[in-house]
Amino acid sequence: MTEQFDKTYCGFIAIVGRPNVGKSTLLNKILGQKISITSRKAQTTRHRIVGIKTEGAYQEIYVDTPGLHIEEKRAINRLMNRAASSAIGDVDLIIFVVDGTHWNADDEMVLNKLRNAKAPVVLAINKVDNIKNKDDLLPFITDLSSKFNFAHIVPISAQRGNNVHELEKIVRQSLREGVHHFPEDYVTDRSQRFMASEIIREKLMRFTGEELPYSVTVEIEQFKVNERGTYEINGLILVEREGQKKMVIGAGGQKIKTIGMEARADMERLFDNKVHLELWVKVKSGWADDERALRSLGYMDE
């Protein structure tokens, strides 16, 4: 039975930053489970992922965005940038994540976009455990403080969880009095079908290393429950060239077998249900440059 409170609090929080600074890792750490995929490759997140954390009277609704970056040559990159930018406009708090003291032109671009934001901005300096000379941190903070009026500046390690609880205290202070938007047991508003495609895509990123560029996506062609209660999931992996198809399949089909086994294990943990997963690979030339095709695959800019 849901506990009743005299007052409840709720708010929307956008997690923004350039690609590969740890936004998805931070969201997963806050939620206590993986809902947003992570990889050492930049721009792993392609969709706005909504993560929900409810504790007692407080509900935090997080938007984990694709990484904002300057390069916009392909249609998929333009859509991802627009999706990330639109997340900034309608939230109660913005968490701007940067990678230690590594500041570049993409960070500067994100900062300039935040100048028009109505919500307060918290700077989360991630991966501080990787900063070898901690004496570099204070001048870096001083320099950024002169560029922008941040509400708070919090050094964190999203991977290890260092100082993440301090960030959450700030988040909770930003919540407004109001009704909760989701039931207390929800951790995301995304469907199981969507989460299945994201899990497969994460394994693709992980097991193809640097071999496979970002011209790969996953379409769930079937997601049904059979008479035994098992989830039967068919995933179609789309690549742009025949050579990429061979990379995904691997010698003797070993790579796609590994991808499938690892993805199935993650799905069974997330869905708490037995899963039968089948994967196919198909060449669809130019899909990442075709906005109509991207929208049909679920890539939206709003």
Curated annotation (Swiss-Prot):
Cellular-component GO terms for this entry: cytosol; plasma membrane
Main localization (coarse): cytoplasm
Molecular functions per Gene Ontology: GTP binding; GTPase activity; ribosomal small subunit binding; rRNA binding; small ribosomal subunit rRNA binding
All copies of domain KH type-2, residue ranges: 208-285
Positions of the UniProt region annotated as G2: 43-47
Span list, region G1: 17-24
Residue span of region G5: 156-158
InterPro entries linked: G_ERA_dom (IPR030388), GTP-bd (IPR006073), GTPase_Era-like (IPR005662), KH_dom-like_a/b (IPR015946), KH_dom_type_2 (IPR004044), KH_sf_prok-type (IPR009019), P-loop_NTPase (IPR027417), Small_GTP-bd (IPR005225)
Alphabetized PROSITE patterns for the sequence: G_ERA, KH_TYPE_2
Residues covered by region (G4): 126-129
Region (G3) residue spans: 64-67
Subcellular location: Cytoplasm; Cell inner membrane
Gene Ontology BP term (one): ribosomal small subunit assembly
Membrane topology of the entry: Peripheral membrane protein
Source domain of life: Bacteria
Domain Era-type G stretches: 9-177
Annotated Pfam families: KH_2, MMR_HSR1
List of residues binding GTP: 17-24, 64-68, 126-129
Keywords: Cell inner membrane, Cell membrane, Cytoplasm, GTP-binding, Membrane, Nucleotide-binding, Ribosome biogenesis, RNA-binding, rRNA-binding
Family membership noted in the UniProt record: Belongs to the TRAFAC class TrmE-Era-EngA-EngB-Septin-like GTPase superfamily. Era GTPase family.
Function: An essential GTPase that binds both GDP and GTP, with rapid nucleotide exchange. Plays a role in 16S rRNA processing and 30S ribosomal subunit biogenesis and possibly also in cell cycle regulation and energy metabolism.
Assembly behavior: Monomer.
PANTHER family tied to this protein: GTPASE ERA (PTHR42698), GTPASE ERA, MITOCHONDRIAL (PTHR42698:SF1)
Name this protein carries in UniProt: GTPase Era
Originating species: Haemophilus influenzae (strain ATCC 51907 / DSM 11121 / KW20 / Rd)
